[in-house]
C-alpha cells in the first residue's frame, strides 16, 4: 500500500524489499529484488550493502519474517529548548554583529526514508511491533541538540531571530544537514517539516 514498505527477512538477513503498492509474489528461487517506489535509488544502494539471499537447497530458511514499515510522515512531535542557546545576529550593511540567547519551541515531523537502515540499526529482529514511542524520546533529544548548529547555518543568511519561523524551508534543510549522521545515514530517517512558534530572547538581549 502507499506509505508502506514490506521487507522479507531470512535468518536475520534481508532478502526482499518492496515499497510499491500492489500484489507481490515472493519466490525464493530467484535473485533478490527490490522495488523502491517513492523511496528512491538510495534504497537500492543500501540493499546492495546489507541485503543477501540465503538458499537452503530450495527449502525455506528456519526463520523467515515479513515486516511492514510505515513510510508516511509522522507528525505532531513537539519540541522546546529548556535552556537558551547562542545565536549570532549579523548585518554586513550596518556592521551589526552580536550574540543573543534564544529559546524556541514548536512541532516537527519526520519519516522513514530508508527502511533497510531503520531495520539494521533500530528495530532489528523485533518479534511483534516496534512503535514510534520507543524511539521518539531519543529523536526529540537529538533534534533539540541539532537546533544550535542549524541556527548557526541560518545566521549566515543574516536573519534576525524573529525571521526564522518564516524561513521554515531553510530551517528544515539545516536540521537535516545537522542530523545527517545520526538520522539519515544511520537510521534512515529524515526531517520533513518544522513549524516554530515565535522565538524568545533573554530580557537583557531585547
Give the location of each predicted region.
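N-terminal hydrophobic membrane-entry segments
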Residues: 1-205
Amino acid at each position: 500500500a502507499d506509505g508502506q514498505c514490506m521487507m522479507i527477512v531470512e535468518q536475520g538477513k534481508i532478502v526482499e524489499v518492496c515499497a510499491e503498492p500492489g500484489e507481490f509474489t515472493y519466490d525464493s528461487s530467484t535473485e533478490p529484488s527490490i522495488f523502491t517506489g517513492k523511496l528512491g535509488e538510495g534504497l537500492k544502494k543500501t540493499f546492495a550493502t546489507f541485503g543477501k539471499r540465503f538458499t537452503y537447497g530450495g527449502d525455506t530458511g528456519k526463520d523467515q519474517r515479513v515486516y511492514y514499515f510505515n513510510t508516511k510522515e509522522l507528525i505532531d512531535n513537539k519540541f522546546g529548548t529548556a535552556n537558551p542557546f547562542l545565536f549570532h545576529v549579523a548585518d554586513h550593511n550596518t556592521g551589526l554583529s552580536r550574540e543573543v540567547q534564544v529559546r524556541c519551541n514548536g512541532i516537527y515531523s519526520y519519516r522513514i526514508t530508508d527502511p533497510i537502515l531503520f531495520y539494521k540499526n533500530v528495530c532489528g529482529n523485533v518479534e511483534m511491533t516496534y512503535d514510534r514511542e520507543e524511539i521518539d524520546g531519543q529523536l526529540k533529544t537529538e533534534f533539540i541538540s541539532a537546533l544550535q548548529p542549524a541556527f548557526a547555518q541560518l545566521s549566515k543568511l543574516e536573519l534576525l531571530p524573529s525571521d526564522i519561523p518564516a524561513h521554515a524551508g531553510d530551517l528544515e534543510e539545516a536540521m537535516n544537514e545537522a542530523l545527517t549522521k545520526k538520522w539519515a545515514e544511520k537510521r534512515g530517517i529524515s526531517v520533513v517539516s518544522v513549524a516554530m512558534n515565535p522565538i524568545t530572547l533573554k530580557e537583557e538581549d531585547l
